[in-house]
Structures are given as structure tokens and as C-alpha cells.
């Protein structure tokens, strides 16, 4: 998201395709996801960021660089970056995330808890003396939190989220129709059919 232009610059999955032992990143995001299950033995499909933490530092840096070089025309080194992280994440994990973003070329990096970032993105005034329940469904983690007076009052996370839903869709289609679909296809179906409905009542 570019705050100056008020628009989303990159909206893609944190997936990378790497080559050989060097782990050279050759494809990222949707392009990499589409290659899942179709790569040669010399190529690997990796998730360098999982459950809100860094699982492969070098690949995470390579992925971020490719995203930013493609979309920001090499100006990333001149900007300050804000990165959302799960509530309750440890100091070691925080430092790893900061180091990845700095290594990718950012001038400065600030971490913000995911529930706060989600609330701000939804237009909620987080500084009000009111409690707002925020549900953040990521790829590997679903986080539920109460936000009030500019902070997270309480939060709880479970390691089941978007990826699990994708896998459930894949298994359902295979069981019902005996057809195997790609993870990217399952994700598209999830996004199209699983959007929240404003004004829905029970």
C-alpha cells in the first residue's frame, strides 16, 4: 500500500519459486503459486513467511525485492515501511521481519500489530473509547482481537486460516468430482464465494 498515492501496489501471496541449492528466486506471488505442482526437480516452491514469521530469511528478502523492484521502480530505498505482524509475536521474530525489510532496501521499518492495521484499513477510529472486535484471516493464522484507545486490549490466534480453506476446497472438489485443481484455483474460488456480506443479519 502506498500511503502517498492511497492505493494498493502489491496484493499477491508470499510464495516464491527458487532454483537449486543457491535458492535464487525466479518467480514470486501469483506467478509462483500457479507453478505449484508443475515445477522441474531443480525448482522449489517455498513459503518464506508462514504464520506471521520468517521461515527462510534469504528467500524472504529475494521475494520482497522482486515485488518492490517490479512495482516501485527502485525507489524502495527512499521510503519508510510499516509492516503488520501478529499480536504477541516474539522479539526474535520481530527482529527477523525488520531485518528482511531493511535487507530488501527500505530506509526505515515500523511494526504494527495486525488487528490495529486491519482496524485502520477498515476505517475504524482506533483511538475512540470503544471496543471493536477485529477478525484477521491470514494465510496460516486467524487472529481475533479487541481494539480500543489505540491499542490491542486482548487477542487470540489459531493456526488455521486461508491456506486450510484452500486445501479443504481442493479436497472437496477431488472427492465430489474426482478432479484435482490447483491451489491458485481454490484460492480464487474462496475469494469469490467467501466475501463478507455487509448488512447480513441472523
Please place each PLM-identified region on the residue numbering:
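Conserved Rossmann-like nucleotide-cofactor binding loop
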Residues: 140
Amino acid at each position: 500500500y502506498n500511503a502517498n498515492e492511497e492505493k494498493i501496489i502489491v496484493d499477491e501471496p508470499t510464495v516464491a519459486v527458487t532454483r537449486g541449492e543457491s535458492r535464487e528466486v525466479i518467480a514470486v506471488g501469483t506467478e509462483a503459486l500457479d507453478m505449484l505442482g508443475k515445477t522441474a526437480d531443480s525448482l522449489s516452491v517455498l513459503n518464506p513467511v508462514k504464520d506471521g514469521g520468517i521461515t527462510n530469511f534469504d528467500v524472504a528478502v529475494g521475494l520482497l525485492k522482486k515485488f518492490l523492484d517490479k512495482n516501485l521502480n527502485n525507489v524502495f530505498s527512499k521510503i519508510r515501511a510499516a509492516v503488520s505482524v501478529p499480536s504477541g509475536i516474539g522479539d526474535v521474530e520481530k527482529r527477523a521481519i525488520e531485518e528482511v525489510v531493511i535487507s530488501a532496501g527500505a530506509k526505515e521499518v515500523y511494526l504494527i500489530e495486525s488487528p490495529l492495521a486491519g482496524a485502520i484499513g477498515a476505517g475504524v477510529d482506533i483511538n475512540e473509547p470503544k471496543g471493536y472486535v477485529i477478525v484477521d484471516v491470514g494465510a496460516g493464522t486467524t487472529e481475533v482481537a479487541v481494539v480500543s484507545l489505540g491499542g490491542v486490549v486482548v487477542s487470540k490466534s489459531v493456526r488455521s486460516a486461508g491456506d486450510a480453506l484452500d486445501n479443504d476446497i481442493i479436497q472437496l472438489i477431488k472427492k465430489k468430482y474426482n478432479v484435482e485443481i490447483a491451489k491458485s484455483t481454490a484460492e480464487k474460488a474462496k475469494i469469490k464465494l467467501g466475501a463478507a456480506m455487509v448488512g447480513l443479519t441472523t
